[in-house]
């Protein structure tokens, strides 16, 4: 069961002026499920994106990178069930055929379409079925289609992930709505996750590009479920410019800071929802590392802890075998780390317990305190490296028996 992840309701999601969303059952992999999503963007919309760093980059990601560079995106098309990764030249041809078909359906050029796929790797995309499903998705286009889209992009997810909020910018109300999917193969940069965030703010392309990268780094690039990096992950931010605010072009201005805070907030909530719905997860863990020389080494330590199977299984069992945390810190690759200056805490919203200091177990630590904290569903591991002022946070979950079962049964 997801960890404190509340099922989203249709009324929770706000339409974004300039964006219409439709879904359809295309039978990509399984019958009788909505697996095709079409998103139409108003003319003049600006789009930014960041994509997987996996060298085995999927065909749709390769095409997305080319098309987004053109600077005039009018549509997004997303299929679930088949990733169209590891499919060679045929995969690229299928992704291109998808863009051609979407362009014909919407009256735009193929180069104005961004394709996205998620699902099983090394299987050919049934492009004929996808294209046959486009008329139904087109007929379904509407401003309030976000709820259905959040469900249509799911794979092993157990709950849809979607967030809306509004913010005042330049005397205008700006609306943001985002959806994401992912539950396994989650580890930056990024993972088997798709994220789509739309707003109606008017913002320069340069600032939108920078903001998208920053938001991804602070959210989707700060989560891990199992340490595997996918071939298909993509995070897209759309700004339609229809809110009526003066275009935001000053990175130091209050308007940009308001938009920045809102985009990062929605991105973090979408990313955390992925971890809360991690395959087989029973605990949501925040790994907060401070006192580093720079953010890079803080993130190294946080990921070493958050990706350790031994740490994750200990948390599943509520077993305070906390030497596993110290071992993970030790192999994180931090040069000249003085373990005698380390301090480690376990915490919840109600309390924080000092576990280790001066290179060993804290004199005040009692195992029953560790057990009490680890029995909670939400736990923070705080580490002070004691060598600087930098800090970083990573979110992860535990490993349960169900993680193995879900992945063993994935293709069945």
From Swiss-Prot:
Task: Supply the EC number(s).
Answer: 2.3.1.35, 2.3.1.1
Localization annotation: Cytoplasm
- Which pathway does it operate in? Amino-acid biosynthesis; L-arginine biosynthesis; L-ornithine and N-acetyl-L-glutamate from L-glutamate and N(2)-acetyl-L-ornithine (cyclic): step 1/1; Amino-acid biosynthesis; L-arginine biosynthesis; N(2)-acetyl-L-ornithine from L-glutamate: step 1/4
Primary site of residence: cytoplasm
Q: Which residues make up the annotated site Involved in the stabilization of negative charge on the oxyanion by the formation of the oxyanion hole?
A: 118-119
**Gene Ontology biological process terms, A to Z:** L-arginine biosynthetic process; ornithine biosynthetic process
Keyword annotations of the record: Acyltransferase, Amino-acid biosynthesis, Arginine biosynthesis, Autocatalytic cleavage, Cytoplasm, Multifunctional enzyme, Transferase
> What is its biological role?
Catalyzes two activities which are involved in the cyclic version of arginine biosynthesis: the synthesis of N-acetylglutamate from glutamate and acetyl-CoA as the acetyl donor, and of ornithine by transacetylation between N(2)-acetylornithine and glutamate.
* Protein name according to UniProt: Arginine biosynthesis bifunctional protein ArgJ
Instruction: Please name the source species.
Output: Aromatoleum aromaticum (strain DSM 19018 / LMG 30748 / EbN1) (Azoarcus sp. (strain EbN1))
